[in-house]
Amino acid sequence: MFDKKAARLRRAKKTRAHIRFLGVHRLTVNRTPRHIYAQIISPNGGEVIAQASTLDSSLRSGATGNADAATSVGQMIAERAKAAGITKVAFDRSGFKYHGRVKALAEAARENGLEF
């Protein structure tokens, strides 16, 4: 049987293994129907260096499940990464399609100074 969630997790596992091999910081994205989350994780995978999500108090008052909210999260994660001294990351889309909210977050992070 084809399981949509299992297929997404399989894709995510392969991507994370490759990023760990590269040994660079990764920008990981997780989305739910209502919120979107982004984290910068250290190369060894043991430490979250920066995070942003639609649960942050500055974004929570508006709509949280659309591309505009994802753009705001992308801007916020780029600012927090630069404050932590990180400019180059690998993009881990967690097996989600590069489309819609995931794409909006990635493009906003690039426009605000993160290099993928």
UniProtKB/Swiss-Prot annotation:
GO molecular function, a single term: 5S rRNA binding
CDD domains per the UniProt record, alphabetical: Ribosomal_L18_L5e
Keyword Transit peptide annotated: no
Disulfide pattern: none
Annotated keywords: Ribonucleoprotein, Ribosomal protein, RNA-binding, rRNA-binding
Keyword Secreted included in the entry's annotation: no
HAMAP family associated with the record: Ribosomal_uL18_B
Quaternary organization: Part of the 50S ribosomal subunit; part of the 5S rRNA/L5/L18/L25 subcomplex. Contacts the 5S and 23S rRNAs.
The protein's name in its UniProt record: Large ribosomal subunit protein uL18
Organism: Psychrobacter arcticus (strain DSM 17307 / VKM B-2377 / 273-4)
